[in-house]
C-alpha cells in the first residue's frame, strides 16, 4: 500500500474513532502518521488534516492534543516549503540545478525549523485553522471522485469497497447487517437457486431500514436485530413465504412492527392476555337486573331503572368500606336505563 493510501486509511479510522469517542486507539494512528513521509499532494488529496484538527479540538487527552499539534505544525512547514520552492525555482539556470542535484543529501534548515516548532509547541490555534482552511477545501473536492491509484493495483471490486469505506464510515456496518439478514432469510431454506433472490431481498430490506433510521444509528441497529430474530424464529416461517410470494414487499417488511411480524399463535395469545386484563379491571357496565318503575333516577329523574344485588368486592371498594359481616357484603345496585347512571345503597333490604 502506498503512502497516500495509508494516510487516507488512517484519516478515515481517526474520523470513525472520534465519532465513536474512542480515544484510546488514537495514539497509535497519530504515531503512524508521524513515521509516514507526507507531501503537499498527500495533504491536498486526503482528509488527514481535518481528522487531526478534529483530534486537536475535541479530544480530552492532553498528550494526544500535543501529538496532533506537532503533526499540524510539521505539515504547515512542509506546505510553506513547497510553496516557496515553487515560487523561487530557477527555471533559467539549469547548471545550478545540476550542481544541487549532485551535491548529495544535505540537511535542510527548514526541517530543523519544523522540529523546533514541534518541540516548543508554538503553533497557535489561528495558524492551525488557517492550515485546515488552506488544505481541507481542496481535499473535499478531490474526495468526491476517488481515483483507482489511491488504492494501488487490485481488483475493481475491492477497490470500490475500499473507496466506499473511506467515504462513508457506516459502510462496514451496513454490509454486516446485510449479511445477517441474508443468513436469517436462508436459515429455513437452503435452496441454491434462491440464493441470489434472498441476497436481493436482504439488500433492499437493509436500504429501507437505513432510510427510516439513517439519523439514529441505535434505532437502525435495534430494527435490524429485531428483523433478524423474527426471521430466524422457526414459528415465523410465514415471513419468508410472504416475501417469496410477493404478498409482502421488502419495503413493507422493513416498516413492519414487532406486533405485525408475530405469528398467529402469538397474536391470539396476546389478544387473550389483553382481553383477560380488561375483564379483570373492568367495572360492571351492564348488569342484568329486575326492571322497575318504582325508583326515580337521581340524575334524569325518570322511572326506568333496573335493580340487582351485587357484592361489594365487584366494585373494587377499599377495605375500610367493606364490612366484615358476610350478610352485609351484598348491596342493592341500581342502573338507569335512560341516562346510564349507576348507584348503590347498602341500607335497602333485598330478598
UniProtKB/Swiss-Prot annotation:
Compositionally biased spans, kind Polar residues: 103-119
GO biological process, one term: regulation of transcription by RNA polymerase II
Alphabetical list of PROSITE patterns matching this protein: TFIIS_CENTRAL, TFIIS_N
Membrane-crossing residue ranges in chain numbering: none
Domain TFIIS N-terminal: residue ranges: 5-82
Biased composition (Basic and acidic residues): 145-165
Lineage: superkingdom: Eukaryota
Domain TFIIS central span(s) in chain numbering: 173-289
Pfam families noted in UniProt: Med26, TFIIS_M
A cellular component annotation (GO) from this entry: nucleus
Gene3D superfamilies on file: 2.20.25.10, Conserved domain common to transcription factors TFIIS, elongin A, CRSP70, Transcription elongation factor S-II, central domain
Span list, region Disordered: 86-119, 144-169
Classification via InterPro entries: TF_IIS-typ (IPR035100), TFIIS/LEDGF_dom_sf (IPR035441), TFIIS_cen_dom (IPR003618), TFIIS_cen_dom_sf (IPR036575), TFIIS_N (IPR017923)
Protein's name in the database: Transcription elongation factor A N-terminal and central domain-containing protein
Amino acid at each position: 500500500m502506498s503512502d497516500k493510501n495509508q494516510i487516507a486509511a488512517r484519516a478515515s479510522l481517526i474520523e470513525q474513532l472520534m465519532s465513536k469517542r474512542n480515544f484510546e486507539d488514537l495514539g497509535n494512528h497519530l504515531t503512524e502518521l508521524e513515521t509516514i513521509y507526507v507531501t503537499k499532494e498527500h495533504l491536498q488529496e486526503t482528509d488527514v488534516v481535518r481528522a487531526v484538527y478534529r483530534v486537536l479540538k475535541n479530544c480530552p487527552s492532553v498528550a494526544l492534543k500535543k501529538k496532533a499539534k506537532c503533526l499540524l505544525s510539521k505539515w504547515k512547514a512542509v506546505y510553506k516549503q513547497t510553496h516557496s520552492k515553487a515560487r523561487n525555482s530557477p527555471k533559467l539556470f539549469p547548471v545550478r540545478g545540476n550542481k544541487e542535484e549532485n551535491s548529495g543529501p544535505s540537511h535542510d534548515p527548514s526541517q530543523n525549523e519544523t522540529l523546533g516548532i514541534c518541540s516548543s509547541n508554538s503553533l497557535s490555534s489561528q495558524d492551525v485553522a488557517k492550515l485546515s482552511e488552506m488544505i481541507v477545501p481542496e481535499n473535499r473536492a478531490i474526495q468526491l471522485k476517488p481515483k483507482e491509484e489511491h488504492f494501488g493495483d487490485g481488483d475493481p471490486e475491492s477497490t470500490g469497497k475500499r473507496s466506499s469505506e473511506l467515504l462513508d464510515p457506516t459502510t462496514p456496518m451496513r454490509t454486516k447487517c446485510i449479511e445477517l439478514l441474508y443468513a436469517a432469510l436462508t436459515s429455513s431454506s437452503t435452496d441454491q437457486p434462491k440464493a441470489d433472490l434472498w441476497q436481493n431481498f436482504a439488500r433492499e430490506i437493509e436500504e429501507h431500514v437505513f432510510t427510516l433510521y439513517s439519523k439514529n444509528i441505535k434505532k437502525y441497529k435495534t430494527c435490524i436485530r429485531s428483523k433478524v430474530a423474527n426471521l430466524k424464529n422457526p414459528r415465523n416461517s410465514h415471513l419468508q413465504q410472504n416475501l417469496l410470494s410477493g404478498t409482502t414487499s421488502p419495503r413493507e417488511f422493513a416498516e413492519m412492527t414487532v406486533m405485525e411480524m408475530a405469528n398467529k399463535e402469538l397474536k391470539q395469545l396476546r389478544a387473550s392476555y389483553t382481553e383477560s386484563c380488561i375483564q379483570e379491571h373492568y367495572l360492571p357496565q351492564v348488569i342484568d337486573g329486575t326492571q322497575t318503575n318504582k325508583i326515580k333516577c337521581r340524575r334524569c329523574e325518570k322511572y326506568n331503572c333496573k335493580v340487582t344485588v351485587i357484592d361489594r368486592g365487584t366494585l373494587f371498594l377499599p377495605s375500610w368500606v367493606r364490612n366484615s359481616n358476610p350478610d352485609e357484603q351484598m348491596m342493592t345496585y341500581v342502573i338507569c336505563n335512560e341516562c346510564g347512571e349507576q348507584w348503590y345503597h347498602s341500607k335497602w333490604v333485598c330478598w
